Amino acid sequence: MNIRPLHDRVIVKRLEEERKTASGIVIPDTAAEKPDQGEIIAVGKGKAGEDGKIRTLEVKVGDKVLFGKYAGQAVKIKGEEFLVMREEDIMGVIEG
């Protein structure tokens, strides 16, 4: 990937959800909701605080995260879709 986020922004690749129900019914793309989980692909250097010092981000590359349904700006890079969002749009890190 050839994109480097600036400041407190991160690049997230959505994690694909199961397209089949427990009973075996296949959910078409048009009816499926977009997943609200993703993996951090790249992180910016951080945001300057009021004192002028850069506050590094809490998330790191490889973290699995939760975010809001409408968080981020979708971008396509080499045919793959990613989200660019601010760290504050991330609700939590999935651990374990």
Curated annotation (Swiss-Prot):
GO terms for molecular function: ATP binding; metal ion binding; protein folding chaperone; protein-folding chaperone binding; unfolded protein binding. Heptamer of 7 subunits arranged in a ring. Interacts with the chaperonin GroEL. Belongs to the GroES chaperonin family. One of its GO terms (biological process) is chaperone cofactor-dependent protein refolding. Keywords: Chaperone, Cytoplasm. Its main location: cytoplasm. PROSITE patterns: CHAPERONINS_CPN10. It is found in: Cytoplasm. Together with the chaperonin GroEL, plays an essential role in assisting protein folding. The GroEL-GroES system forms a nano-cage that allows encapsulation of the non-native substrate proteins and provides a physical environment optimized to promote and accelerate protein folding. GroES binds to the apical surface of the GroEL ring, thereby capping the opening of the GroEL channel. InterPro entries: Chaperonin_GroES, Chaperonin_GroES_sf, Chaprnonin_Cpn10_CS, GroES-like_sf. It comes from the Bacteria. One of its GO terms (cellular component) is cytoplasm. This is Co-chaperonin GroES.
